[in-house]
Amino acid sequence: MFKWPWKADDESGNAEMPWEQALAIPVLAHLSSTEQHKLTQMAARFLQQKRLVALQGLELTPLHQARIAMLFCLPVLELGIEWLDGFHEVLIYPAPFIVDDEWEDDIGLVHNQRVVQSGQSWQQGPVVLNWLDIQDSFDASGFNLVVHEVAHKLDTRNGDRASGVPLIPLREVAGWEHDLHAAMNNIQDEIDLVGESAASIDAYAATDPAECFAVLSEYFFSAPELFAPRFPALWQRFCHFYRQDPLARRRENGLQDEGDRRIVH
């Protein structure tokens, strides 16, 4: 179990969290020992700074809390935990939840409807998740609800709303937008050809630039082999922004055998 000297007087108990057990999930299996240590330190700080609020009778064990914190910190591992400033609570439902959604169509009419959501990220408010999809985010499958919502938070640091362009130098914005829209068009072409269910990238990525950035961030961290060869130029932009290269990391450190990568509950 990791123990941090700088947290010796911490009354929160985060220094005694089951960090090593929390690391035993496929999406984190390729991290080096140095990266694991850094992620653990960052996750401990995350739990100091944020409040995880379990809703509707859900109970979060210390292991659950540790893994949630690690997934939040993975995208900002090299950016710094300050990139997660701007919210103080993470609300967690047991399962996907129903919300009242309001939206305006192309001619200005406002519509209201009840929709099922997996997660939400409010610009100046909490992140909302559900436990069923958080558990699915432990796998290296291309799906990661936590990374998706963190990407939206990072996206909105660049302005009033999520645009698909995170906080990058102004000189890089045009190239980013070009490559992102090219990826959206490519994904839509595949959907038109084979259908949403058979598409190799989640069809949600084709809906708008903000969702494309969030969905591809999921693949960036949990299924880089599906992202990098298909969109090499955009892949390099993601590597530059996140200051990580999950595909190179995976090749350098190697993935453990399936028997060694089982999730410990």
Curated annotation (Swiss-Prot):
Described purpose of this protein according to its UniProt entry: Involved in the modulation of the activity of the glucose-phosphotransferase system (glucose-PTS). Interacts with the transcriptional repressor Mlc, preventing its interaction with DNA and leading to the modulation of expression of genes regulated by Mlc, including ptsG, which encodes the PTS system glucose-specific EIICB component.
Cofactor dependency: Zn(2+)
Enzyme Commission number, as recorded: 3.4.11.-
Species annotation: Klebsiella pneumoniae subsp. pneumoniae (strain ATCC 700721 / MGH 78578)
Record keywords, A-Z: Aminopeptidase, Cytoplasm, Hydrolase, Metal-binding, Metalloprotease, Protease, Zinc
Molecular function GO terms recorded: aminopeptidase activity; metallopeptidase activity; zinc ion binding
Compartment annotation: Cytoplasm
Keyword Zinc: yes
InterPro entries to which the protein is assigned, alphabetical: MetalloPept_cat_dom_sf (IPR024079), MtfA_enterob (IPR057256), MtfA_fam (IPR010384), MtfA_N (IPR042252)
CC cofactor note: Binds 1 zinc ion per subunit.
Comment field on protein domains: Zinc induces structural changes at the active site. The holoenzyme adopts a self-inhibited conformation and is most likely not productive.
Quaternary structure and partners: Monomer in solution. Interacts with Mlc.
Protein encoded by which gene: mtfA
Top-level enzyme category: hydrolase
Cited Pfam families: Peptidase_M90
Main location: cytoplasm
Residues binding Zn(2+): 111, 148, 152, 211
Annotated family: Belongs to the MtfA family.
Regulation affecting activity: Association between Mlc and MtfA may induce structural changes that activate the peptidase activity of MtfA while inactivating the DNA-binding ability of Mlc. The aminopeptidase activity is partially inhibited by metal chelators such as EDTA and phenantroline, but not by inhibitors for serine-, aspartyl-, or cysteine-proteases.
An annotated GO cellular component: cytosol
Protein name as it appears in the record: Mlc titration factor A
GO BP term (any one): proteolysis
